[in-house]
Amino acid sequence: AVPAFDLNDIGDVVVGCAMPEAEQGMNVARIGLLLAGFPVSVPGITVNRFCASGLNAVADAAMKIMTGQCDIAIGAGTESMTAMPTMMGNKVTVNPRAFESDEHVAIAYGMGLTAEKVVQQYGVSREDQDAFALASHHKALAAIAAGRFRDEVLPYTVRSHLPDLSSNTVRLTERLFDTDEGPRADSSAQALAKLRPAFSARGSVTAGNSSQMSDGAAAVLLMSEAAVQRTGATPIARFRSFAVAGVPPEIMGIGPVEAIPRALTQAGIAQADIDWIELNEAFAAQALAVIRTLDLDPAKVNPHG
């Protein structure tokens, strides 16, 4: 349980955003806090590590507490993919010096092409990718049906103002969002097998074995031991360790292969000690490559899809 406490006691709010530009720019963390009605004294900072931005935000918030900078902090992640500049026809520009030679050309690879590179280097078949994706949908739908996310999803009324040209008025529509829309009940092995490659004409990465575009956000409240005792909060987890690792940009999805062992070493635990593994599955290809390379137990990976 999270008891009431003075919001002014929050030392910092760290928000991860993979594309902190356009509507998500101008320090979206601070803007979000102000729009949410937090006291003006509560600061906010936006951090970016692409896919791991939200994860890094939680780690940064934890480290602020661990180093004594504050007692209470929030780590969060937010992304509105429909508002990203690239979704509106705008091109993302890169520092031109990056392409003065062939050495760093992989910086220009889209994520889909990096997934195809993983397929090639790690020998992941189209059939295995589709099977993994289908299983992920089934697990997510089962978790939703069982109410696993009920206490994690904050119901939100989505309001849309749309022009009605027949009446020359603006029409307000409202709908309640309380369930993730990504998992698809109509997906099947046959339907997935019919999809064409999305990123390379002779590739195997499709829209079906890749994650969908999403808009969403999540946050974690972190406290020191002293703050927990002072507020009477009931912790649900303890922050033990965090690690990052650099890998070739063209196969960026295999980052966990290097980072997971480092995090385990920092925490002083073995891989076999972990009962639940949440692994990035932006593409089935990269998830399978990581699972196989690290010999992870598939039953422990993303149990809820």
Per-range role (PLM):
Residues N48-E79, V119-R148, A219-A226, A289-R292:
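Active-site-proximal alpha-helical scaffold in enzymes
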Residues A4, D128-R230, T293-K300:
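N-terminal extracellular/periplasmic Venus flytrap/periplasmic-binding protein-like
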Residues C70-Y122:
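Flexible glycine-/small-residue-enriched beta->alpha junction loops
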Residues G25-M26, A83-G89, S166-V170, E250-M252:
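Short acidic, glycine/serine/threonine-rich loops at helix termini
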Residues V13, C17-I72, A106-L113, A185-Q212, ...:
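Conserved catalytic cysteine-centered active-site region
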Residues A1-V2, G32, V94-F99:
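Short catalytic helix/loop segments, enriched in acidic residues and glycine
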Residues A1, M19-A22, I45-A62, E100-M111, ...:
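Active-site pocket-shaping loop/turn-to-helix segments
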Residues V15, T114-E116, E152-S160, R240-G305:
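Active-site pocket-lining segment
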